[in-house]
Amino acid sequence: STSEIAIIDKENKEINIQSDNIIICTGSEPVSIPGIEFDEEKIISSTGALSLKSVPKKMIVVGGGYIGLEMGSVWSRLGSEVHVIEFLDHITPGMDKEISLEFMKILKKQGIKFNMQHKVETIKKSNSGAVVSTVDKDGNKNNFDCDVVLISVGRKPNTEGLNLESTGIELDEKKRIKTDKIFKTNVHNIFAIGDVIEGPMLAHKAEDEGIAVAENIAGQSGHVNYDTIPGVVYTSPEVATIGKTEEQLKQANTNYKIGKFSFMANSRAKAIDDAEGFVKILADEKTDKVLGAHIIGPQAGELIAEIGIAMEFGASSEDIARTCHAHPTFSEAVKEAALSVDKRAIHS
């Protein structure tokens, strides 16, 4: 039935629940490399990386995306020798390239080692840990020994085992549930949100979608502005991004202008000796409307919210620049970057 779900409780009893509307939000799980299984001891997922019993002497992270770098950064700061193996020539695919390059430079200074343009062929467990075999861009074969290998190459939606086929719900080629603009599936009373539908697998995206779908079911006009959903890498320093990247604007032939401001010139960052990184704001060349922003540095995940509000209300970089920011705060770097869009930064 499309109006009833069956669940198994902790006592292994089946419970049937009826409802006029059903929302599927079963999340996602880590994926591995084909032919390689997680044992969560020597070959681990991001879930296993949260519960290691001791600090590994050497950890290899397969994948240079958000989650792999977050986990690698944590274990590096705890004392592990961390090596990142990435198939592409840069980390954090999809991120503004200038930020990505600065990010890798900072992580290298912290001692994390990077092996770029390496394709993983096999991962085999050994007595002491595991051996990762790769082929680099020149066709050379390489073997990397480690105590633990963290595979962080993506996640997949949890849509298997739900008996969705009995309802006729349509999935796409990535096993995500197809929905319309109000999160409704092809079945009139079943909706889906979060990691099981298209879009970035982010908790705050799912939360906003959950609110929107509840509003829609209640007869209101819930919606999510996907252009203003931030992404944050919780490393040290943090990295945050929202809106368009410079590469996306170039590809779309959009005329834009750039404002940048370094935390080296921010008094709060200097005072706490955490002044690496910068704020980058992209604005439309003609209208000055903020199109995107990218931050690497202290409290980047907090600072990006200001840009999100500005973009939600269609603000210009001048609107941000004319807003008084308290001194001394990290947020002054955002104001200065906005001033820099028109080459008016004060402390650059």
Predicted regions and their residues:
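Rossmann-like dinucleotide-binding cores of NAD(P)H-dependent redox enzymes
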Residues: 50-51, 56-60, 66-142, 199-207, ...
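Flexible, glycine-rich terminal cap/loop adjacent to redox cofactors
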Residues: 235-245, 250-348
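A short alpha-helix-loop-beta-strand transition element characteristic
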Residues: 29-31, 114, 170-172, 220-228, ...
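Glycine-rich dinucleotide-binding loop and its adjacent helix/turn
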Residues: 26-81, 85, 113, 165-167, ...
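Short loop/edge segments at beta-strand edges and connector loops
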Residues: 2, 26, 45-47, 116-118, ...
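Core beta-strand elements of the Rossmann-like FAD/NAD(P) dinucleotide-binding domain
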Residues: 12-21, 139-148, 186
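Glycine/serine-rich phosphate-binding loop and adjoining beta1-alpha1 elements at the start
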Residues: 2-42
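FAD-site-proximal beta/loop scaffold in flavoenzymes
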Residues: 39-55, 142-218, 223
